[in-house]
A protein has these predicted regions:
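A hydrophobic, multi-pass inner-membrane permease signature
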Residues: 1-280
Length: 280
C-alpha cells in the first residue's frame, strides 16, 4: 500500500515537473534572446553567441518606427482606468446580488452566467459599429469602455466571497443606523481584501494583454496602439529579422508588471479564488 502511494506521488511529481519545464522553456528562451546581439529569428542554437543590453536600450530609444514608450504608457493608462471602473462595477454588482433580494434577481444572475460563457470577440463587429456611430473608434477611451463595459458579467466569484461574510454583521449595522452604502464601503469591503485584490488583478490583466479588441478598434492609428499591437508589428515579415530580439526585450518588459503583481499579491489572489468558490 505504501509502495503504491509512493509510486503514485512520484508519477504526479514527474508530471508536474514535466509541465513546469514545458512552461518555463519558452520563458527562458524569451529572456535569454532578449540579450542576444545577433539579429534574426530563425536560429539553430539556444544560447546566444554574444550578449548585449542594447535591445532594451533600442526598445526605448529607437522610436521612429516603433514608439514603444508611448505604447507602454497607452497600455498603462487604459489598464489602470479599466481596472478602476471594472473593479467598482464587479464589487458593487456582486454585493447587490449577494445581499439584496429583488424581482428578477435569479433571472439576471442566470443571464449573466450564460452571457459570460460566450467569448467577447463574438460581439466584436457590433461593438465596433457602435463605437464608430458615436465617433469613438481609434481612441483610448473606446478601449476603456469596451474593457470595463462587460466586466460586471464576471460577478460570480466576488458574489461567492460576499456570501461567506455573515449577515449578522449587516443586521448589527442596520440596528446602529447604517445604510446599505455605509455597510458596503465601511464593513464589507474592509473584510473582503482577498476578493478585492483578485478582482483588481483580473481587471488589470485583461486590457494589459488584449490584442483582438485593440486591433479592431485602433486599426492603423499607431499613436494610440497598445503594447500588444506594437510588439506584433515588430515580428511582421518585413521587420522580424531586425527587430526579433527587440521584440523579446519588449515582451519581457511587458511581463514585469504582471509578474510583480502576482508575486506580491499571490496570497490574496489564492484566498480570493478559494473564498469565492462557494455555491451562492
Amino acid at each position: 500500500m505504501r509502495l503504491r502511494k509512493n509510486l503514485t506521488n512520484a508519477l504526479i511529481y514527474a508530471l508536474l515537473f514535466t509541465l513546469a519545464v514545458i512552461w518555463l522553456v519558452p520563458l527562458f528562451f524569451l529572456i535569454v534572446h532578449s540579450f542576444r546581439a545577433e539579429p534574426g529569428a530563425a536560429i539553430r542554437y539556444l544560447f546566444p553567441k554574444e550578449y548585449t543590453a542594447g535591445n532594451y536600450i533600442r526598445l526605448f530609444t529607437d522610436t521612429e518606427l516603433f514608439n514603444f514608450p508611448r505604447w507602454y504608457m497607452n497600455t498603462l493608462v487604459v489598464s489602470l482606468a479599466s481596472c478602476a471602473l471594472s473593479t467598482l462595477y464587479v464589487l458593487m454588482i456582486s454585493y447587490a446580488f449577494s445581499r439584496l433580494r429583488f424581482r428578477f434577481r435569479e433571472s439576471m444572475m442566470r443571464a449573466g452566467l450564460v452571457l459570460n460563457m460566450f467569448p467577447g470577440f463574438m460581439a466584436m463587429i457590433a461593438v465596433y459599429f457602435i463605437l464608430k456611430a458615436v465617433g469613438l473608434t481609434q481612441s483610448l477611451l473606446a478601449l476603456v469602455l469596451v474593457y470595463s463595459g462587460s466586466a460586471a458579467l464576471s460577478y460570480y466569484v466576488a458574489k461567492g466571497f460576499f456570501d461567506t461574510i455573515p449577515r449578522a454583521l449587516d443586521e448589527a449595522a442596520y440596528i446602529d443606523g447604517a445604510s446599505k452604502s455605509t455597510i458596503f464601503w465601511r464593513i464589507t469591503l474592509p473584510l473582503s481584501k482577498p476578493i478585492v485584490v483578485y478582482t483588481v488583478l483580473m481587471s488589470f490583466m485583461a486590457p494589459w494583454m488584449d490584442f483582438i479588441f485593440a486591433s479592431v478598434i485602433m486599426k492603423d492609428n499607431y499613436d494610440n496602439y497598445t503594447v500588444a499591437l506594437g510588439l506584433f508589428q515588430m515580428i511582421t515579415r518585413e521587420n522580424i529579422y531586425d527587430y526579433f530580439t527587440v521584440f523579446c526585450a519588449g515582451a519581457v518588459v511587458v511581463a514585469i508588471p504582471i509578474a510583480l503583481l502576482f508575486l506580491f499579491m499571490q496570497k490574496y489572489y489564492v484566498e480570493g479564488v478559494t473564498g469565492g468558490a462557494v455555491k451562492g
